[in-house]
């Protein structure tokens, strides 16, 4: 513990928190254009083909974004909405594509957690 004299001389340092989504530039979401849509494999204990897209954002930064849900209609030059949120088993993927916004369709035949996947209520 510092003495009062040390605190008078130096003072307390405030912790600087690291920005987890720098490419969004403080926005909740950003629009972007898909430059490449592909699949990749997750880290060690898991095994799958995760769908991801390389997206050039309106802030002129290119990021890798995860495409959530079962099936998608994205291809090169699709306009997408990107939000923050990392995928734990994909290194370097710190953004997600918003389903049901802009060119991205919602997940078909989805009954639960529909708002997360842009699925409309079935009549």
Swiss-Prot record:
InterPro entries: NA-bd_OB-fold, Ribosomal_uS12, Ribosomal_uS12_bac. SUPFAM superfamilies: Nucleic acid-binding proteins. GO terms for biological process: translation. Residues 9-18 have a biased composition (Basic residues). GO terms for molecular function: rRNA binding; structural constituent of ribosome; tRNA binding. Pfam families: Ribosom_S12_S23 (PF00164). Disulfide bonds: none annotated. The keyword Chloroplast does not apply. PROSITE patterns: RIBOSOMAL_S12 (PS00055). Keywords: Methylation, Ribonucleoprotein, Ribosomal protein, RNA-binding, rRNA-binding, tRNA-binding. The modification 3-methylthioaspartic acid is found at residue 89. Residues 1-32 are annotated as: Disordered. One of its GO terms (cellular component) is small ribosomal subunit. NCBIfam families: rpsL_bact. Belongs to the universal ribosomal protein uS12 family. With S4 and S5 plays an important role in translational accuracy. Interacts with and stabilizes bases of the 16S rRNA that are involved in tRNA selection in the A site and with the mRNA backbone. Located at the interface of the 30S and 50S subunits, it traverses the body of the 30S subunit contacting proteins on the other side and probably holding the rRNA structure together. The combined cluster of proteins S8, S12 and S17 appears to hold together the shoulder and platform of the 30S subunit. Part of the 30S ribosomal subunit. Contacts proteins S8 and S17. May interact with IF1 in the 30S initiation complex. This is Small ribosomal subunit protein uS12. It comes from Thermobifida fusca (strain YX).
């Amino acid at each position: 513990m510092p003495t009062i004299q040390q605190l008078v001389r130096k003072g307390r340092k405030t912790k600087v928190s690291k920005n987890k989504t720098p490419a969004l530039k403080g926005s909740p979401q950003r629009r972007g254009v898909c430059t490449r849509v592909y699949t990749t494999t997750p880290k060690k204990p898991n095994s799958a083909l995760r769908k991801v897209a390389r997206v050039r954002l309106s802030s002129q930064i290119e990021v890798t974004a995860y495409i959530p849900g079962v099936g998608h209609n994205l291809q090169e030059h699709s306009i997408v909405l990107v939000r923050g949120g990392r995928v734990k088993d994909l290194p370097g993927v710190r953004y997600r594509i918003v389903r049901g916004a802009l060119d991205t369709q919602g997940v078909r035949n989805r009954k639960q957690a529909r708002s997360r996947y842009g699925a409309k209520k079935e009549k």
